[in-house]
Swiss-Prot record:
Organism from which the protein derives: Candida glabrata (strain ATCC 2001 / BCRC 20586 / JCM 3761 / NBRC 0622 / NRRL Y-65 / CBS 138)
UniProt entry tagged with the keyword Nucleus: yes
Protein's gene: DPB2
GO molecular function terms attached to this record: DNA polymerase processivity factor activity; DNA-directed DNA polymerase activity; double-stranded DNA binding; single-stranded DNA binding
Region (Disordered): 107-147
InterPro entries: DNA_pol_a/d/e_bsu, POLE2
Protein name: DNA polymerase epsilon subunit B
Primary localization: nucleus
GO biological process: DNA-templated DNA replication maintenance of fidelity; error-prone translesion synthesis
Keyword set includes Metal-binding: no
Job description of the protein: As accessory component of the DNA polymerase epsilon (DNA polymerase II) participates in chromosomal DNA replication.
Length: 719
């Protein structure tokens, strides 16, 4: 389109282009053209299509392609100059990639093919491409004589019996290049699942920034080499850490049906109850609720009015709870707050707070509080234009981000159906290699798995029972030397299982006791993300295992059409330690407990049994482990972040916060939480798995996971 030949550039006045642009962009595609956008289009069309731009059919074709890409990227209704430049750059990148692929295909040398004409004579393709010697060949002539200047008498002569053969070869050479495009050749290619299977550490994950004004995601190229080596984030990364997470959550919330009603029927005293009912009933109630969010800066001077605020819950320097959004912060009063159950309210969580604003003291009295409702993965991908955020289907550039083609997604789903035999094995956490009890359990498990080697085996740390630091152990050797010897022992054990080391991809994810974060934290929760185990300890393992990845924490696996997140963290322990206790809830719990004790003290044994049965029948008494696991999963996925805490609780590397974001939520989240029991839950289409601890008494536990069916089976091996 952009290389149609030599043209004479011209300067087109925007009013001259307006009728054509109106017919194509406005009437056909429903776009509204701004004056600066029309000027940018005029400059490009004048320099590309020249003086004959009105009569050139490529001009109309360009405008149609431009409008199609604009609609695909969901850039909005108004065509401005910035968007015009971005779309034109993307079109150029696409054409450049297509031309490069065509040139690569054209540069493939033709293969020599042998033909038999049926009469016993064998003829090769080289015979038709080589001119037969003739008496005139000995005559001297100019060396630069072209093939068009050769007389017919000097041209290559072909026998009559070889004419059908020559026609066949000519058709085979010319037809594919003429009739089949590179896209069609890609569609006809058989997909190899290994091309769409990749383990992505945090250092390899692509970084994207979010523009809240345009509501678009942009690719951020890596930093220069000096800053990458120093690994020093700048101050801008600190401010973007909160803003990006807040705006992503806000835009996700505004896409919810409860916030898209045009009816101005906002009733703050019942909005939280209505929102909760809509979430529980999957938005089956069509009654408009008219929910709207108010920025904190707009509360000034509006004393005694009801509002709904979206902000980060944290404690201010005065020791009071406050809410903070992009416009400011305000102190809150939670003495009469009724929170939605089934969630962990922790410092750093983004919450929806409903209440009354008082000018005196600039305080917001919260009456109810909940989390922003979650969103399914497919809906989020549709909103962002099916961007390939993992970089599996193409290479990112500053002006171009590859997308997930719908046809490729369907083909990958079909390929998953043919790979139902593939499975992932998730060994429980705390694989202490310095514990002989653990090593015996590993040997038993590997013996069983070697009979039918899985596709992936994931080993979760910590791999040492004590933090690895610069100190001498009880054996008068350094802890680092002992740590290395433990991995050498593991490598020696794996060498006995040929199927595993040859056909299985081994993934090792560090824990809080593993270097080098253990030098600073001494076993406590360190900063995230955590880098992989250093290569100094992995040399022997790399020699034994053909496919091994020393992963970071967290890490991501791209498996065909799915995204799997692996994360090792004691999340439940942190939530229990730092959750906010609301006075109304605690007082109600204390009253119920006191009333129950009083009734049991005043009743006989028979009456007590009846009383307990009545209490159990009135309340849905689920096991505490089930309730805790549900709260953990809902808290993580609704927050859209693996560490929704403030920096004082869980530090985060400022420039690596994008590796902890769950936007969109993954297909599967594997959370190795040693402070919680093993579980597997599905919430908003995301399968969440916790393998639990590896050793339980004399049992070695692990989980088999089939990605296609998302089926989980817990296995136990006694030893």
């Amino acid at each position: 389109m952009f290389t149609s030949g030599k043209v004479l550039p011209t300067k087109i006045q925007p009013p001259l282009l307006r009728p054509m642009a109106y017919r194509v962009l406005s009437k056909k595609y429903g776009l509204s053209i701004k004056s600066d956008g029309l000027a940018a289009l005029s400059d490009f069309i004048g320099s590309t299509f020249g003086m004959d731009w009105k009569r050139n059919p490529d001009t109309i074709k360009f405008l149609e392609v431009f409008a199609t890409v604009w609609k695909q990227q969901e850039r909005g209704l108004f065509v401005d100059s910035t968007g015009v430049k971005d779309v034109i750059n993307e079109l150029k990148e696409r054409e450049k990639a297509t031309l490069q692929e065509s040139q690569n295909m054209a540069s493939i040398p033709p293969k020599t093919k042998t033909y038999n004409n049926g009469g016993g004579k064998t003829t090769t393709i080289d015979r038709f491409l080589t001119k037969r010697p003739s008496p005139s060949d000995n005559d001297e002539g100019p060396l630069d004589q072209s093939i068009d200047d050769i007389p017919v008498s000097q041209a290559t002569q072909i026998d009559e019996e070889e004419l059908p053969m020559a026609q066949e070869i000519s058709d085979q050479i010319s037809s594919p290049a003429r009739d089949q495009t590179p896209e069609e050749e890609f569609d006809n290619r058989i997909l190899n699942w290994r091309d769409y299977f990749r383990i992505i550490n945090t250092t390899d994950q692509k970084k994207f920034s979010y523009n809240p004004v345009k509501r678009q995601i942009f690719y951020q190229p890596p930093k220069d080499q000096l800053k990458s080596v120093l690994k020093i984030p700048n101050a801008q990364a600190k401010t973007d850490l909160f803003r990006t997470r807040y705006f992503l959550t806000r835009d996700r919330l505004l896409r919810n049906e409860s916030f898209q009603s045009s009816h101005d029927t906002f009733n703050p005293l019942s909005s939280m109850i209505q929102l909760k009912n809509n979430i529980n009933n999957n938005n089956q109630d069509d009654t408009p609720t008219g929910l709207s969010i108010t920025q904190i800066k707009n509360l000034l001077g509006r004393d005694g009015q009801n509002f709904l605020i979206l902000g980060v819950l944290k404690m201010n320097p005065k020791g009071q709870w406050s809410l903070e959004d992009a416009s400011g912060s305000i102190d809150i009063d939670i003495s009469q707050t009724l929170p939605s159950p089934g969630l962990f309210y922790i410092p750093g969580a983004i919450v929806l707070a409903e209440g009354i604003y008082y000018t005196v003291g600039h305080t917001f009295a919260v009456t109810s509080m909940t989390f922003p409702p979650g969103e399914r993965r497919d809906k989020t991908l549709d909103h962002i234009g099916n961007l390939d955020l993992l970089g599996i289907h193409g290479t990112e550039k500053s002006s171009y981000i590859p997308r997930l083609d719908n046809e490729i997604k369907i083909r990958l789903h079909l390929l998953e159906q043919d790979l139902t035999h593939q499975k992932f094995v998730l060994l429980g956490g705390d694989l202490f290699l310095d514990d002989q009890h653990v090593m015996d359990g590993l040997k038993k498990v590997f013996t069983k798995l070697d009979q039918e080697a899985p596709t992936v085996i994931v080993l979760f740390g910590s791999f040492s029972s004590f933090p690895v630091h610069a100190a001498m152990s009880s054996k008068n050797i350094s802890s680092t030397t002992e740590y290395k010897n433990n991995f050498d022992s593991l490598a020696e054990m794996l060498s006995q299982f040929e199927n595993i080391i040859n056909h299985t991809h081994v993934v090792l994810i560090p824990g809080p006791h593993d270097p080098w974060v253990s030098l600073c934290s001494l076993g406590a929760n360190g900063s995230l993300p955590q880098s992989s185990i250093p290569t100094h300890f992995s040399k022997r393992m790399n020699k034994i295992c053909k496919n091994i990845t020393w992963a970071s924490n967290p890490t991501r696996i791209a498996y065909l059409s799915q995204e799997i997140v692996l994360f090792r963290d004691n999340f439940l322990e942190l939530c229990k330690r730092h959750q906010i206790l609301f006075p109304v809830v605690e007082s109600k719990r204390a009253e119920d407990l006191a009333e129950l004790e009083e009734q049991m003290a005043n009743n006989s044994i028979d009456d007590t049994t009846i009383l307990v049965d009545r209490i159990i029948s009135e309340k849905q008494q689920l096991p505490a482990k089930v309730l805790e696991s549900r709260k953990v999963v809902k808290t993580l996925l609704d927050q859209g972040h693996l560490s929704p805490f403030v920096d004082s609780i869980r530090p985060i590397s400022w420039d690596m916060d994008h590796t902890l974001t769950l936007y969109p939520i993954p297909s599967t989240l594997i959370l190795a939480d040693m402070s919680s029991a093993a579980y597997d839950l599905t919430y908003n289409g995301c399968k969440t798995i916790n393998p639990g601890k590896f050793i339980h008494k004399r049992q070695a536990r692990y989980i088999q996971f089939q990605p296609y069916l998302k089926s989980v089976s817990q296995e136990e091996v006694f030893f």
